[in-house]
A protein has these predicted regions:
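Flexible, solvent-exposed coil segments and beta strand-coil junctions
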Residues: 50-61, 103-108, 134-138, 162-166
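Outer-membrane beta-barrel pore domains and translocons
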Residues: 1, 12, 29-33, 81, ...
């Protein structure tokens, strides 16, 4: 079993520039990761007999250092955005880091340090909101994520239409390099 629980907090009060229309959001996240392994559910190679097949009564030499573990996990991030009204283009961008403390996994502690540690994951994203009218924007953006040797980059764009003061409709798509195309449809309801 794998269970995560996190609490996040963000500070949105950093405003600067002309009319205080440039904004910086700072965020932190802390939580726990809990893992539990039921060793009785595993089937090991030593339990297979080429003639009679699987026999759960066969002795095994495999064991875990621990079958249950809970560890602290910490993350943080920052986002900049230009909130200048009536501007033709407003830029935004951010970065976030997960597993900053590189939590250890005691269940596999007899392995090498690289296998025993959850690697740092970081995310970078940015884009520009091109305001075509007071109701319609087109928003191209890029997202890059990396954890250990795994990397993923997506490029996308969507159109946002302001229905009223409370609601925006969005439609667009993303291309994840060397992998997939993902359509996107969304609704943003404010003041719920």
């Amino acid at each position: 079993n794998y269970f995560n629980a996190y609490a996040s907090v963000a500070y949105t009060g950093v405003k600067f520039g002309k009319g205080n229309n440039h904004r910086l959001v700072l965020a932190m996240q802390a939580g726990i990761i809990n893992r539990h392994v039921d060793q009785s559910k595993f089937k090991w190679g030593e339990q297979w007999n080429p003639i009679t097949g699987y026999n759960s009564g066969n002795a095994i030499t495999e064991s875990f250092a621990a079958t249950s573990a809970t560890t602290l996990d910490i993350g943080a991030g920052a986002l900049y955005y230009d909130a200048t009204p009536d501007k033709k283009a407003n830029a935004f961008g951010g970065v976030s880091f997960f597993h900053i403390n590189k939590p250890k996994d005691p269940i596999i502690s007899n392995q090498t340090v690289a296998l025993n540690t959850i690697p740092l994951r970081y995310t970078r994203h940015g884009g520009v909101s091109f305001n075509l009218s007071n109701k319609t924007s087109i928003i191209p953006h890029v997202l890059h994520m990396q954890q250990g040797t795994a990397r993923e980059t997506s490029l996308g764009t969507y159109v946002k239409y302001n229905v009223n003061e409370e609601t925006d409709l969005m439609i667009g798509g993303y291309y994840r390099f060397k992998d997939a195309i993902a359509p996107f449809v969304g609704v943003d309801w404010r003041n719920l």
